[in-house]
A protein has these predicted regions:
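Secretory targeting and sorting signals
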Residues: 2-23
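Secreted, propeptide-processed cysteine-rich mini-domains
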Residues: 24-39
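Extracellular disulfide-bonded cysteine-rich modules/repeats
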Residues: 42-50
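Extracellular mucin-like PTS domains
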Residues: 68-92
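Non-catalytic architectural context of zinc metalloproteases
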Residues: 88-247, 251-252, 282, 344, ...
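Beta/coil-rich, acidic/histidine-enriched accessory regions frequently appended to metallopeptidases
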Residues: 100-107, 150, 374, 378-412
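Zinc-dependent metallopeptidase catalytic helix centered on the HExxH motif
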Residues: 210-316
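Active-site-proximal alpha-helical
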Residues: 296-300, 315-395
């Protein structure tokens, strides 16, 4: 028993001596056993150093916590979007340019495009030739087209090869301003002898302002007059309720009337001056006077878009009456211009006249109609002027034009 007790005591002492000092929690300044030994505690790393003759733990160095390394997230590769194949815009089919009235009869569909194209080219390549313009608004009135000079400018360029006014005025007035407008017109016109001709009972009558504006509800017409000094005046009726009427706001009306002004100007200083300025229709076919002005208005308003020109021209084309070729032939070239009198109010001189002028323009450009007017002013007949311009006898062209209009109108 005594021997076992000694054995147990010996083992206990041996285990105590074998346990390392570092097993104790290190503390700055506390005794350690071996220089260079390290130990960690409370987030610090301590090193056993020699201080004098002693070995002690230093103050320790804080252990940096490792930054967490983000686990990369896999990004799915984008699915490529297929690039759509562009659908080619179909190129509009441009019809062959007509060179003769026979070409027109074979392919009337070429007329609208080439009349528009030749007008567009003329406007874009020319400069306006009038210089002095004044826009006058009556005291109790307004104006539907706020910037009429744009329309006058385009029409001036369309007919830049022809004489244009030295000075012209546009007078906008309502029914309330009727007397004021007539007085202003007579003051500016300043040609008493010609004014008496214009105001004769078989022509315009004594009151040009009232002709344009006969009542408050019907004050939306317009009319030009030109004196022998080349001064032109356009009277424009004003009805504010017509602000949504496109033809009165987009320049069409102004271009129509300025075409008349240029027609007038061809008679200034001409052999037929007095009667021609008193009434163009004394010499020029009525359908050419009004149809030519309708064409000038639409072509000058829409040189930038064949589609808009096409839409606008339908106002005339769709209102052409359905008649046979014989009726149209007599309408175009009647025995007497008195036959046109009943057709003024019903519109044929505008609608049929537009179609004929469009045909002229498709063949020879926008100046064709005005050159006929100019030659008539100089004393030529319609037959002579037409043949000079087109190289074809008028009587040969009339039946072709009549057949074309009758055939095309029958399709609508």
């Amino acid at each position: 028993m005594k021997h076992k007790a000694h054995l147990v005591l010996a083992i206990s002492l041996l285990l105590t001596l074998a346990a390392p000092v570092q097993a104790a929690t290190p503390k700055a300044g506390a005794k350690c056993n071996k220089a260079g030994t390290t130990a960690t505690a409370n987030g610090k790393k301590f090193t056993c150093i020699k201080s004098g003759t002693k070995l002690v733990w230093n103050k320790g160095v804080a252990i940096k916590k490792p930054s967490p390394v983000a686990t990369p997230t896999s990004v799915p590769s984008p699915t490529p979007t297929p690039t759509p194949t562009p659908t080619p815009t179909p190129t509009p089919l441009i019809p062959a340019e007509p060179k003769s009235f026979a070409d027109i009869e074979r392919n009337y569909q070429s007329v609208a495009y080439w009349a528009w194209k030749k007008s567009k080219d003329k406007i874009e390549s020319s400069k306006r030739t009038f210089v002095d313009f004044e826009n006058i608004i009556a005291p109790n009135s307004g104006i539907l087209n706020k910037n009429p000079i744009v329309a006058f400018d385009a029409t001036s360029r369309l007919f830049s090869d022809f004489v244009q006014p030295s000075k012209f005025y546009s007078i906008s007035y309502s029914y309330e301003d009727l007397n004021w407008a007539q007085s202003k017109f007579e003051e500016l016109f300043s040609d008493p002898e010609l004014l008496r001709e214009i105001q004769s009972p078989n022509r315009g009558g004594p009151n040009q302002a009232r002709n344009v504006c006969p009542s408050p509800e019907r004050c939306h017409s317009s009319s030009p007059n030109t004196n022998r000094a080349g001064v032109s005046i356009i009277l424009v009726g004003y009805t504010p309720t017509r602000a949504n009427n496109l033809g009165e706001t987009n320049g069409d009306l102004q271009s129509h009337e300025f075409t008349h002004v240029i027609q007038d100007q061809q008679f200034v200083k001409s052999p037929r001056e007095m009667n021609g300025l008193a009434s163009l229709k004394h010499y020029v076919p009525w359908w050419l006077v009004e149809g030519g002005a309708d064409f000038g208005g639409i072509a000058s308003t829409h040189p930038d878009s064949f589609q808009r020109y096409s839409d606008a021209r339908l106002r005339n084309v769709n209102n052409v009456p359905r008649r046979d070729a014989a009726w149209y032939e007599n309408f175009i070239n009647p025995v007497s211009n008195q036959e046109w009198i009943p057709l003024g109010p019903t519109g044929e001189i505008y609608t049929v006249g537009f179609v004929i002028t469009e045909i002229f323009t498709a063949l020879k450009g926008p100046g064709a109609q005005m050159e006929i007017v100019r030659q008539i002013a100089q004393g030529k007949s319609m037959d002579e002027a037409f043949e000079n311009v087109f190289g074809t006898p008028w009587k040969s062209a009339v039946p072709i034009i009549a057949r074309v209009i009758a055939t095309e109108r029958a399709k609508r």
